[in-house]
């Protein structure tokens, strides 16, 4: 692939790690953010120490506070901003773009107010004549490992397979590899909903339960993610892939996962507001729990783990009692997609 110009919107941990992947591939990378100290640090010290204490970025990776400058003459735009501001940033991008670009996102969540997936938001806010079909970049990927060039395999999903193949070529190298998929609904719901299950797995750890219990919540969590996804139109096979079970494993078993760490803290009895303040990063699984619970209620989808976590976070239920309560639920067959 020839050298491409790519704007990455959101210089957090994942946006920064992906900027390094693209820079390693010889592309022109521009990070955009709205925190002046962070932008200055990236440009002058070539570090982003809030997320990576010991990493020095290549000097060719630049950052700017000016969205127009970031978007000038780019071939592709990658959204890696928190779910709650995706629509706002997309509107700002739409007001500036003057040429067609490949639009990608690598965030994982559902919009709280509308319950919409992020690709839908981008489609609504950015006119079709200025963008490709949206490409979703998702899968098992700790930024802390990608930034040190550890082997990482993820998915590029789009309704337009050629757009997905472009992104596959854009990012893939000797340590970072993408597989294509056309099931956007499946890939996005898997990426968003696995954060809920990671909170549950972390809570079990915080409560002192062992590997049997953690394996159970991850496996049955995958079952309820699949039930909801299929109801929304996803292909159930997607959930057995990188963006499904792969992402669920990496997020539901690792201390690198902010959602797992948040769940572990909840299990230890810490208050949510203290957890969020101490972590200093967005915990997408907290907001996604509420959205997923509401969607499941509207559609009549059985999601006991999501319900237990929702009641603990939003209704003040004791998290141990909520989890143990699932052990007395009605008996069911293992393979039920409804």
UniProtKB/Swiss-Prot annotation:
It is found in: Cytoplasm. Gene3D superfamilies: N-(1-d-carboxylethyl)-l-norvaline Dehydrogenase, domain 2 (1.10.1040.10), NAD(P)-binding Rossmann-like Domain (3.40.50.720). The keyword Metal-binding does not apply. It catalyses: sn-glycerol 3-phosphate + NAD(+) = dihydroxyacetone phosphate + NADH + H(+); sn-glycerol 3-phosphate + NADP(+) = dihydroxyacetone phosphate + NADPH + H(+). Pathway: Membrane lipid metabolism; glycerophospholipid metabolism. SUPFAM superfamilies: 6-phosphogluconate dehydrogenase C-terminal domain-like (SSF48179), NAD(P)-binding Rossmann-fold domains (SSF51735). The active site is at 194 (proton acceptor). NADPH binds at residues 13-14, 108, 143, 258, 282, 284. One of its GO terms (cellular component) is cytosol. HAMAP family: NAD_Glyc3P_dehydrog (MF_00394). This is Glycerol-3-phosphate dehydrogenase [NAD(P)+]. The lineage of its organism: Bacteria, Bacillati, Bacillota, Bacilli, Lactobacillales.
């Amino acid at each position: 692939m020839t050298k491409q110009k790519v704007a990455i919107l959101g210089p957090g941990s994942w946006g920064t790690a992906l900027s390094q992947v693209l820079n390693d591939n010889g592309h022109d990378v521009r990070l955009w953010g709205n925190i002046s100290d962070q932008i200055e640090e990236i440009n002058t010290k070539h570090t982003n120490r809030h997320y990576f204490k010991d990493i020095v970025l290549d000097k060719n990776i630049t950052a700017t506070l000016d969205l127009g400058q970031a978007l000038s003459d780019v071939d592709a735009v990658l959204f890696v901003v928190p779910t709650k501001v995706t629509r706002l940033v997309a509107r700002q991008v739409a007001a500036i773009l003057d040429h067609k670009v490949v639009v990608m996102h690598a965030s994982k969540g559902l919009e709280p107010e509308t319950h919409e997936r992020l690709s839908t938001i981008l489609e609504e806010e950015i006119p079709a004549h200025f963008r490709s079909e949206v490409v979703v970049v998702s899968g098992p990927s700790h930024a802390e490992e990608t930034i040190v060039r550890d082997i990482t395999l993820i998915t590029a999903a789009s309704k337009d397979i050629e757009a997905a193949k472009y992104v596959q070529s854009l990012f893939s190298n000797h340590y970072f590899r993408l597989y294509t998929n056309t099931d956007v609904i499946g890939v996005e719901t898997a990426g968003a909903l696995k954060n809920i299950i990671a909170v549950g797995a972390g809570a079990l750890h915080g409560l002192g339960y062992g590997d049997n219990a953690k394996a159970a919540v991850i496996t049955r969590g995958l079952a309820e993610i699949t039930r909801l996804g299929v109801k929304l139109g996803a292909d159930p096979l997607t959930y057995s892939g990188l963006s499904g079970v792969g992402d669920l494993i990496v997020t539901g078993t690792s201390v690198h996962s902010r959602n797992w760490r948040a769940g572990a803290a909840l299990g230890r009895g810490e208050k949510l507001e203290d957890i969020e303040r101490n972590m200093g990063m967005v915990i997408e699984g907290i907001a996604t729990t509420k959205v997923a619970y509401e969607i499941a209620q509207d559609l009549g989808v059985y999601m006991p783990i999501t319900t237990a976590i929702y009641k603990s976070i939003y209704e003040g239920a004791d998290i141990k009692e909520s989890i143990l309560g699932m052990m007395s639920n009605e008996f069911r067959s293992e393979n039920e997609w409804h």
